[in-house]
Regions:
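Short loop->beta-strand "edge-of-pocket" segments that line small-molecule binding or catalytic clefts
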Residues: 2, 35-37, 62-67, 106
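Short, hydrophobic beta-strand segments that form beta-sheet elements in well-ordered domains
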Residues: 39, 46, 105-109
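Acidic, PIN/NYN-like endoribonuclease modules and their adjacent C-terminal/linker elements
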Residues: 1, 97-127
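Active-site neighborhoods of divalent-metal-dependent phosphate/nucleic-acid chemistry enzymes
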Residues: 65-110
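A general structural signal for well-ordered alpha-helical segments in protein cores
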Residues: 24, 43, 53-56, 73-76, ...
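Histidine- and aromatic-rich ligand-binding microenvironments
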Residues: 5-7, 38-39, 89-90, 111-112, ...
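Alpha-helix capping/helix-boundary segments
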Residues: 8, 42, 72, 95-96, ...
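Short, well-structured N-terminal submotif of metal-dependent ribonuclease cores
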Residues: 1-37, 47-58
């Protein structure tokens, strides 16, 4: 199973995004390799962008939507707490990475920041 990050979904959905081609190719590759999931956190982040729920559901058809568990929330909070405040990043990124880490899944993302905070997480990037 591969958990796809919001950054990849955003680039894939937006044909004018500078990473659109890379994200699209990466998604095609992982869809051929494994089952693909997105977090409910990604749904929340995408809802801010003004898409309708119906359009979003159609775009993500075939992807498994996973909920945040208590274990995911705990792990996200523990890692976030270790991050120096001057480098704080949005907590949603930590929820999504915690979900992948807790399940032992690979994580497809365009966001290469703060990878070292997740030593047991296998990151996948489009080339």
């Amino acid at each position: 199973m591969i958990l796809v990050d919001t950054s990849t979904i955003v680039a894939w959905l937006d044909r004018s995004h500078p990473d659109h081609k890379t994200a699209s190719q990466a998604l095609v590759t992982v869809l051929m390799e494994d089952d693909v999931a997105v977090s409910v956190v990604t749904l929340a982040e995408l809802a801010v962008g003004g898409r309708t729920r119906e359009a979003l559901e159609a775009d993500l058809k075939g992807m498994i939507v996973i909920k945040v568990t208590a274990a995911d929330a705990w792990r996200a909070g523990q890692v976030f707490a270790r991050l120096p405040r001057k480098h704080a990043t949005p907590l949603p990124d930590f929820f999504i990475r915690a979900q992948a880490a807790e399940r032992g899944w690979r994580h497809l993302t365009n966001d290469r920041r703060r990878l070292g905070w997740w030593p047991d997480l296998e990151f996948v990037f489009g080339n």
